Amino acid sequence: MGVYTYENEFTSDIPAPKLFKAFVLDADNLIPKIAPQAVKCAEILEGDGGPGTIKKITFGEGSHYGYVKHKIHSIDKENHTYSYSLIEGDALSDNIEKIDYETKLVSAPHGGTVIKTTSKYHTKGDVEIKEEHVKAGKEKASHLFKLIEGYLKDHPSEYN
């Protein structure tokens, strides 16, 4: 088994606490509302939403995937960190056992946020991860993030 690690960093004008509430704490409600073509719904299968919780994300008609299951490892509301693993679903190919994600939102000096993400792909056997697979995932995540950011700018009184 191999582990391939990818890091990404981008910025937002939205303050970290507000962004964390929308992007992490209420994502299961917000994303299907603003991007139903990407995510149809999210449901908790086990747990209470905290560490150990298993969620099923059903993708919308605009996605070429059907569903994935996430296992939440940690949610730190004070430090704005979140980690989970993608453990099942058609986004995992026959060559990938799981993908671990860590997200940290850091308050930036200008009042916005620096978003730092780490993805760790755990492969089966000696399989290598294709760069275009990772790039496509980053582009989709970036697009979804921009939708959330746009929603927050259009609705400034929400998630305070």
Curated annotation (Swiss-Prot):
CDD domains annotated for this entry?
Bet_v1-like
One Gene Ontology term of the biological-process aspect is: defense response
Q: Which GO terms describe its cellular component?
A: cytoplasm; nucleus
Record carries keyword Oxidoreductase: no
| Stretch forming the signal peptide | none
List keywords of the entry alphabetically. Answer: Allergen, Fruit ripening, Pathogenesis-related protein, Plant defense
Q: Which GO terms describe its molecular function?
A: abscisic acid binding; protein phosphatase inhibitor activity; signaling receptor activity
SUPFAM superfamilies tied to this protein: Bet v1-like
Recorded superkingdom:
Eukaryota
Q: Which InterPro entries match?
A: Bet_v_I/MLP, Bet_v_I_allergen, Plant_def-hormone_signal, START-like_dom_sf
The record ties this protein, via Pfam families, to: Bet_v_1
The entry assigns this protein to a family as follows: Belongs to the BetVI family.
Task: Indicate the quaternary assembly.
Answer: Monomer.
- Family annotation (PANTHER family): OS08G0374000 PROTEIN-RELATED, STRESS-INDUCED PROTEIN SAM22
Q: What does this protein do?
A: May be involved in ripening of fruits.
Q: What is this protein called?
A: Major strawberry allergen Fra a 1-A
Q: Which organism is it from?
A: Fragaria ananassa
Name of the gene this protein is made from: FRAA1A.1
